[in-house]
Each structure stands twice: as C-alpha cells, then as structure tokens.
C-alpha cells in the first residue's frame, strides 16, 4: 500500500500513543482514494477503509481535503465529507472548495465537523473576513 510506505500504521499508532490527543491526521483524497506525495500519486487505499484502520489510535482531529475541489470554489464535497465525519472517532476539519458563506453554513450542520479551511474564496474577495467572523460566532 503506497500510503503505508510513507507513514506506516505502526508509526502513526506509536506517535498517537506517545502524544495522546496531539496528532492531527491529514487525509488528502481524490475520488474516494487517498493521495500522497503532494497529491502527485493516488494510492489504492480507500479513504474510509484507512480511517477505519486508524480510528482507535487516538488521533485528535482529521483534516480532510477533497483534492478535486481544492482551489476550485465549487463548494466542498459535502457527500464524501459527511461519510468521513460520520466514520471518524475524532472531529473533522474540511478543506477544499469553499465558495461562499453558504458553504460555511452547510458545513456547520454536518455531524462531527470542527472547522473548515477557507482560502481562495477569501483571497478572491468572495467571502470577507467580517462576514466569516459573523458566521463563525453566530
């Protein structure tokens, strides 16, 4: 398995036990499969299967990026994100595709979502920091 060559499960498990609730795990996925090497290579590992393997390690949170949506402002892949957040034993941070404040509102309604990373929509002026702050603290 390609991903395990870069981060063997025993290493992740050991790190989580040595630093309980201090490890955030980034899951970068494309079409339901984990991607590695800066998104240059797709693995044959299904994201949800991998998550099931590591779920009880004591990971503090997941940062889930849908590569197909990152930087596109086409809205996050809420369907796949919901599957990940429901399967996860820890809170999930969404990354990839935020286009408007409506995406933030929708993300807040999902189970087990701790946050959402907003990049290009702020940079391009589609979401103002003031508008974002109002929604976060609403």
Give residue ranges: language-model regions.
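Active-site environment of divalent metal-dependent phosphoester hydrolases
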Residues: 70, 100-102, 124
